[in-house]
């Protein structure tokens, strides 16, 4: 019995790696992207009841083949997520429908509201009939504050590894082959400044599902809700 289980696991791994190499698209997409996302409206959003940010501008996946996720060390992530794949990667404020070129790929940004607290990147990719293994997802959101909010922490869960920048500064790194768990990692204390704050994230995965969740936690461990999301 154990041999059969090991054989089945090996076969599944082989299929996953072959799918990644060949950049298979999904034959049976399963649930529609509409089950997970709605187009963002012009009106600013707010965090949900638990403080999770659901409005994001997501870039269609960038091709980044990896046979497995054990390579996602701190140094690997800083090198491969810190490099520029498209012009203005760390400076532009992307708009819905805007297009960029990453290598030979022409990719489009989509501004969406997630129906779940965790943003289902895998379903975002399959719903658009895009590559879903061996990829990097870029996510950007704009946070508006009426006043400085000091002493908060950026709290993230991601599948698999990810890296996050607030207002251009590296704020949090989630390395290794990991599952998405809410509040899996938290940053040092930071300040959400009065006015506009820009949060950028990059999520990388080889074979496997991809998603993330983000919120800010104050010094008392309470989710920050007095912000607007654009």
Predicted regions located by residue number:
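Beta-strand-rich ligand-recognition modules
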Residues: 166-214
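Short beta-strands within extracellular/lumenal beta-sheet-rich domains
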Residues: 133-144
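Aromatic-lined ligand-binding clefts that engage carbohydrates, nucleic acids, or primary amines
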Residues: 150-165, 199
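Generic structural detector for well-ordered beta-strands
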Residues: 52, 57-60, 142-144, 189-191
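Accessory carbohydrate-binding/adhesion or oligomerization-edge regions at the termini
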Residues: 20-119, 202-230
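Non-cytosolic beta-sheet module surface loops
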Residues: 145, 154-158, 203-205
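Short structured motifs
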Residues: 123-127, 138-140, 183-187
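Bacterial Sec-dependent N-terminal signal peptides
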Residues: 1-21
């Amino acid at each position: 019995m154990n041999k059969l289980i090991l054989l089945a696991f090996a076969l599944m791994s082989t299929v996953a790696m072959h799918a990644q190499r060949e950049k298979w698209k999904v034959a049976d997409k399963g649930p529609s992207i509409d089950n997970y996302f709605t187009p963002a409206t012009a009106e600013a959003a707010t965090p949900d009841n638990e403080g999770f940010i659901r409005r994001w501008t997501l870039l269609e996946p960038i091709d980044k083949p990896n046979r497995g996720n054990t390579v996602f060390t701190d140094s690997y992530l800083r090198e491969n997520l810190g490099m520029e794949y498209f012009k203005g990667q760390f400076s532009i404020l992307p708009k819905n429908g805007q297009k960029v070129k990453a290598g030979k790929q022409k990719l489009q940004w989509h501004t969406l509201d997630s129906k779940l607290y965790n943003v289902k990147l895998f379903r975002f990719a399959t719903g658009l009939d895009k590559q879903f293994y061996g990829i990097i997802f870029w996510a950007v959101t704009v946070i508006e504050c009426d006043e400085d909010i000091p002493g908060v922490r950026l709290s993230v869960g991601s599948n698999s590894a990810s890296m996050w920048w607030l207002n251009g500064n590296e704020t949090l790194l989630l390395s290794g082959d990991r599952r998405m768990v809410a509040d899996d990692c938290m940053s040092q204390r930071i300040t959400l400044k009065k006015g506009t704050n820009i949060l950028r994230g990059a999520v990388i995965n080889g074979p496997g599902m991809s998603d993330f969740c983000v919120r800010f936690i104050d010094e008392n461990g309470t989710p920050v809700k007095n912000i607007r999301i654009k």
